[in-house]
From Swiss-Prot:
High-level lineage: Viruses, Duplodnaviria, Heunggongvirae, Uroviricota, Caudoviricetes
Keywords recorded for this protein, A-Z: Early protein
Annotated protein name in UniProt: Gene product 5B
Family under the similarity heading: Belongs to the phi29likevirus GP5.5 family.
Native organism: Bacillus phage PZA (Bacteriophage PZA)
Top-level taxon: Viruses
Length: 65
């Protein structure tokens, strides 16, 4: 039986410090977007805004056999 576990990973200094009150203006690089597995750029921007654009909390699923 497979179990999925959500793990929180803190990643520092991912984003250029361009955070403003409007998270649509958070500047992401293509590399950080791909490397840290966000579903899309919009999701990554929302997460970045919640934490001030400096640290990103990411959920990752693992299969436990």
């Amino acid at each position: 039986m497979e179990t999925q576990v959500k793990v929180l990973v803190l990643v520092g200094a991912l984003f250029i410090n361009t955070y403003t009150d409007n998270y649509k203006s958070v500047d992401l690089t293509h590399d950080s977007e791909q490397a840290y597995g966000f579903k899309d750029k919009w999701e990554a921007q929302q997460v970045a805004a919640k934490v001030g654009g400096q640290v990103v909390v990411r959920t990752t699923s693992f299969k436990i056999v």
